């Protein structure tokens, strides 16, 4: 993800992203906040047992985000304050690389606390594999030729999304298509809708609007 952002030309930061109401620069600012959250959480140990795991972390909404949330609006203002794309690139690389090192050093079994919930560090970091993979797809949604997420990340994110839904996508679907359709980032084609229909109750489970 950091590499994909670092390679973007400046003009791409003003283009729309796959997140409602956000340009690429706003999404990159959100990724910086995410990386800071990882750093803070990994050094916030908990004394009580985990209350959630990588699957139950997610709240599934009935409608897609609109971009009108106050925190979303704050992110837009913060992104604008950077003014120059290189500053966003620098800050993401700086904080993101630190978060990556912290993740590598963390004991997966360590109990950590965030948002008034307790997780193992391993489960908490698994949450971010899904989140950042989806946001990588958001980043390149309108940027043909931009670097795609690693295959390993796509496969892991798909598996996690299927666990959240309690159902699997058609095996003929690519991981990218499963993630985009499964989270409502794009509508299924007629052929995809037909495949979903052949799987019984599966269509009723998707899309999942994760929050």
Language model region names:
Residues 2-111:
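Active-site-adjacent scaffolding segments
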Residues 43-55, 81-83, 90, 102-211:
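Structured surface interface patches that mediate subunit assembly and partner/cofactor docking
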């Amino acid at each position: 993800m950091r590499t994909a952002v670092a390679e973007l030309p400046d003009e791409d930061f003003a283009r729309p992203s796959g997140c409602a109401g956000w340009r690429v620069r706003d999404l990159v600012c959100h990724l910086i906040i995410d990386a800071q959250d990882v750093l803070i959480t990994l050094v916030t140990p908990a004394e009580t047992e985990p209350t959630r795991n990588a699957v139950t972390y997610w709240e599934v909404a009935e409608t897609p985000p609109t971009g009108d949330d106050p925190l979303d609006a704050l992110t837009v203002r913060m992104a604008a304050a950077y003014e120059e794309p290189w500053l966003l690139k620098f800050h993401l690389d700086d904080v993101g690389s630190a978060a990556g090192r912290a993740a590598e050093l963390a004991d997966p079994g360590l109990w950590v606390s965030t948002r008034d919930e307790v997780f193992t560090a391993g489960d908490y970091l698994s949450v971010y594999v899904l989140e950042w993979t989806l946001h990588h797809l958001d980043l390149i949604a309108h940027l043909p030729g931009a670097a795609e997420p690693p295959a390993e990340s796509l496969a892991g994110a798909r598996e996690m999304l299927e666990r959240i839904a309690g159902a699997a996508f058609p095996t003929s679907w690519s991981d990218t298509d499963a993630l985009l359709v499964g989270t409502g980032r794009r509508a299924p084609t007629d052929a995809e809708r037909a495949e979903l229909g052949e799987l019984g109750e599966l269509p009723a489970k998707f899309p999942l609007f994760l929050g």
